[in-house]
């Protein structure tokens, strides 16, 4: 299946699911790696590089490649290259941001929201066990944080505010710049989990007064197993992983050079292609949401519509069916989608995000999430709209709904 934009004409095989898939709409769980990224990574995987900490020529070349990737990622978020710390994932970056900062902070109070990624929420819960207090700010019916509610939650003992840039489960873009303006100048650090948003919506660490920002490589169509935390100069952190002095002492262990180089290329492509690709994906998103609401009785969009939503994200709740049954039926017909966050799905628990926006248990059971990406076509959207209504009708009939 050919992609519609850019210079890479061939869709990666990983998006095909063994040749069956007619529509791959689970990019938030795994984004196929861009072939342009793979091409740059290949020499590093085939033995053409050294250790970036070594002093010989291959090591110096490896360090130059590492620093080049750092610069590309910094350009994507408008930050300084020296602030980029490479990690193995955005989850690790979130853990380092919260627990690493808390270990050096004088204050013992944190502010976050009830809809954060589980890596942020579970880090906060772990800090609570260590004697910190945490304020969990509620959201409105579309999952949006009120900056004034964040301001009201701040105390004289607040050390850190952590608010995601956007929800990976319902697509809500948060008012990060407004929160940053409230935090700026109060001696409080501001952390943003930017997974899902960076490369799709404009985000600048300086304009939004961000001190710590977490990124995922795969979310940018880079290789999995790589992430980064951007840290503003003079922001103090304690490492979670100790050993050597790699990554300025913040993250020990030899860097995964092929993955890091790939992440740098992915970041550069995302920066250059963001405006055009986001507009294309927003059109597909609206086509899908409008079509589902029009053809599936009682289907309701979760999260906002329009500019307040991530351009690649469409999520709905469908009463009278269970998401697992719908997804299995869709999969048998060549459509890959999800019920929300892949990380949360592993627990088998009801979505904390859906609970936060007022979806009760029965409604949450019918939560479906479709996320698009660089190779998504209008034909794939139409395949979902052709198949989903009949799937829901059949399952409702079987359930007696």
Residue ranges and their predicted role:
Residues 1-401:
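Pyridoxal 5′-phosphate
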